[in-house]
Amino acid sequence: MLIVETVPILRREIRRWRQEGKRIALVPTMGNLHDGHMTLVDTAKGQADIVIVSIFVNPMQFNRPDDLAKYPRTLQEDCEKLHQHGVNLVFAPADKEIYPDGMEHQTYVDVPELSTMLEGASRPGHFRGVSTVVSKLFNLVQPDLTYFGEKDFQQLQLIRKMIADLAYDITLVSVPTVRDQNGLALSSRNNNLTADEHRIAPELSKIMRSIAEKMAQGERHTEQLLTQASSQLHEAGFVPDELFIRDAETLAPLNTESKKAVILMAAWLGQTRMIDNQQVDLTQ
């Protein structure tokens, strides 16, 4: 497995694989890898000849400098895991490699509406940072396929629209959220939970599943469902942050034409912000 830190070497290796007719997959990450990331990698391994994983803690998508400073950097451990899973190349650039002129003078990629609604409303600039760095990685790697988890659902839809709008010749493969045996969505943030918080954390997905079951049975009073969910989260020990039920394709409010809904939940548990989502088929 190659570990590459610079753009020229990355391009050299990609050029070689292209000349050999290889099918290339890109899995963008910020490191601190867990089994959810490994599922992305394993899915890519089954569909491509070459798997490239980027590890870059993107400063552009952090709203608060202290969050950026606290984000775990575990490159050695990450590379060991990726080697065991048969990854061909890890691209782990420094900030200067991605933003050689600094972020103040960087050209941005902004996806209208999707970047400022829902979670984007409370994290101004976050999704612009995501779309900019992913666009840059796409330009550098020029993959045939790219892999994103469904856990960050708004991010997934944002990248999907960016690929369509900018005419990237890239197939986006979405991979279902990986959960532990209690139903808790795997996340790097779970490492920040105390023992008591770990015990409480699965309640988030249980409450979400309860909403999904009611909607699958025909319930459409979404505001009432969300009010009940907020009360249940409070009772369980969470501080609700953002609770939405939206059209899964557009993330707009549900309407009579919506075929699939997505329940989007974010809540604080102690000092950790937990997020989760679940899609619901509305056509049955």
Curated annotation (Swiss-Prot):
Binding site for (R)-pantoate: 61, 155
UniProt KW keywords: ATP-binding, Cytoplasm, Ligase, Nucleotide-binding, Pantothenate biosynthesis
Residues noted as binding beta-alanine in the record, renumbered to the chain: 61
InterPro entries xref list: Cyt_trans-like, Pantoate_ligase, Pantoate_ligase_C, Rossmann-like_a/b/a_fold
Lipid biosynthesis among keywords: no
EC number: 6.3.2.1
Entries under Pfam families matching the protein: Pantoate_ligase
Protein origin, superkingdom: Bacteria
Reaction equation(s) it catalyzes: (R)-pantoate + beta-alanine + ATP = (R)-pantothenate + AMP + diphosphate + H(+)
Residues annotated for ATP binding in this entry: 30-37, 149-152, 178, 186-189
Gene Ontology CC annotation, any one: cytosol
Quaternary structure and interacting proteins, as annotated: Homodimer.
Family recorded in the similarity comment: Belongs to the pantothenate synthetase family.
Any further remark recorded for this protein: The reaction proceeds by a bi uni uni bi ping pong mechanism.
Name of the protein in its database record: Pantothenate synthetase
